[in-house]
Amino acid sequence: MFACLRIGRFIRLGNVTVKSTNLVLRCVFIRNFATHADHLFDELPQRDLSSLNSQLSSHLRSGNPNDTLALFLQIHRASPDLSSHTFTPVLGACSLLSYPETGRQVHALMIKQGAETGTISKTALIDMYSKYGHLVDSVRVFESVEEKDLVSWNALLSGFLRNGKGKEALGVFAAMYRERVEISEFTLSSVVKTCASLKILQQGKQVHAMVVVTGRDLVVLGTAMISFYSSVGLINEAMKVYNSLNVHTDEVMLNSLISGCIRNRNYKEAFLLMSRQRPNVRVLSSSLAGCSDNSDLWIGKQIHCVALRNGFVSDSKLCNGLMDMYGKCGQIVQARTIFRAIPSKSVVSWTSMIDAYAVNGDGVKALEIFREMCEEGSGVLPNSVTFLVVISACAHAGLVKEGKECFGMMKEKYRLVPGTEHYVCFIDILSKAGETEEIWRLVERMMENDNQSIPCAIWVAVLSACSLNMDLTRGEYVARRLMEETGPENASIYVLVSNFYAAMGKWDVVEELRGKLKNKGLVKTAGHSLFI
């Protein structure tokens, strides 16, 4: 309030000069007063590049990426000479809007104007390309950074983690350690999350030991450590981390521990922890996520009762969790009832309901809800997760025509960039329909894009399609690509390629591959049965 009064007095007294206003704009930007920033910006008799940069940052910080791009276009038309500080918020806007082509055009303009040289601008480029899933470009930009600082290293590590490349993220961390880069709590937290996602116990314990030995702030890393031990099934170790923090624990840590107990079916401890605090939406939502993972309907219903008693059932986030839980437990009627009762449905609400029908094998109903969402009256636009759920539903239900329509709509109508999982699901749809020519045209279009390599998961999907449709020639090409790109030490790929040749009746090749697998001492991670 005091800051607002000072800004008002500044404007009223007429002390509006370029230099003085730039200083106030920076202050307003830091405090995130977007309206005041707009007012000050409009009052300027002259606008220099510094004030324009501040306004760009203000728009982005206020969550208005479209306004950021619109202002940037005006600046570029009026002043062709731009600084690296001008481009940084623009790259952030491109990242938020998922406009790969626009992002590349901005990058090209940076190179043309010599604004790509700074570490800050290159870090923004690394972040932008990783959000597009273009990790090859992220690595290329990172390698061009002359003075790599902690922020640029963290941007690369986060990019791999964001795209599900856990092993590569750990490789970045190992390189940071070799290069003696000063590692922050953020870095360690990211690495712990990677270990949790990959369920790598030994490396996670090593990071925990590093935290203790180097005297890092365990309060900052506590939630990540609790989540890690919970994910690998060591709930007692998670309890030890929580108890070691004593008075420094917070609600987020407790919620993480409760969720971990439920995921590991330690219900007695979970409800004991719940009794230590007043029930809240956050802890109930995280607990419902555990019930969804375990398909535990009885515990989910108990949590639903707690939510009803405390008047939380009007909260959209909690309702989304309830829908997901009932859907995963096969209770589609209850999920639908909760969905219809939500007054203001978010994109998560719609997606959760679509997914509930999808996981229960009703692709037609899933499409019905999706079309209802896309109607103008809903006021909600589908995102990439929504399309992944819908395309997956079409794949499982064998809805080829509808799957094609959804995949095309994603790119053309909503300007969303399909990710690896979208392509895998779409290839599965085409494969079951026997449309191998369409699959190959899709692969050829992807190969024409030299800036992005085709992920291994897509090649695996194409190989499965070749196997299903008895396409030996193309299957052999894909098999060679997989063997080349994953390296000679990947046992799973050897088995996958071997199974392809077995389906083709090429038993001599199968025997040769199995022999190589044995001679190299490679062992495929074995599956397990819940019954045997």
From Swiss-Prot:
InterPro entries from the UniProt entry: E_motif (IPR046848), Pentatricopeptide_rpt (IPR002885), PPR_At4g14850-like_plant (IPR046960), TPR-like_helical_dom_sf (IPR011990)
Transit peptide limits: 1-33
UniProtKB keywords: Mitochondrion, Repeat, Transit peptide
Region (Type E motif): 458-532
GO molecular function: RNA binding
PROSITE patterns: PPR
PPR-type repeats, residues: 48-82, 83-117, 118-148, 149-183, 184-218, 223-248, 250-280, 281-314, 315-345, 346-380, 383-413, 419-453
One term under GO cellular component: mitochondrion
GO terms, biological process: RNA modification
Subcellular location per the Swiss-Prot or TrEMBL entry: Mitochondrion
Entries under Pfam families matching the protein: E_motif (PF20431), PPR (PF01535), PPR_2 (PF13041)
Main location class: mitochondrion
Similarity section: Belongs to the PPR family. PCMP-E subfamily.
UniProt name for this protein: Pentatricopeptide repeat-containing protein At5g66500, mitochondrial
Species of origin: Arabidopsis thaliana (Mouse-ear cress)
Gene that specifies this protein: PCMP-E38
